Amino acid sequence: MLHRAFSVFLFDKENRLLLQQRAPSKITFPSLWTNTCCSHPLYGYEPSEVDTPEDIANGAVPGAKRAAVRKLFHELGIPRKEVPVSKFKYLTRLHYRAKDEFAVNQSMAGGPWGEHEMDYILFIKPGVPVTIAPNPDEVNDVKWVNREELRAMMDPSSGLRWSPWFRIICDKF
């Protein structure tokens, strides 16, 4: 089922990107490396995390940005005050579908899981060091990388596995 999502790319003052490795206990895409934070805006939250067509058309997407702040705290322990909504930049939306090949015991047999998302791409450069305290139920590891380090990590010879949305975003942008 098509649903909304967001992907956060958090950069430090040196333009390094914060990556996370998803926890091995995650139902979908366990242990894969990906961008800083990925999740979904939730209906029923106040203030709202669901954007109106007007918000989307004008590029404001305040709901997706509020959801991103919520999940940066939940997944990575980054305090809300360190990633204010006003610092987020909305780049675009990406529609994609991906089957999770490793969802069942991380075997190639795969499982019934996957994603069909309209993914809002959000960049943030807070301008101050951020506090990171990963939630072990969500995150296995984190790493700050520059462009060259990211390229080396994404090289197939590295043996690292990547989330499909992150690979698509890196290929397209």
Report the location of each language-model feature.
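Short, conserved, surface-exposed binding loops centered on an aromatic residue
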Residues: 9-11, 82-83, 110-114
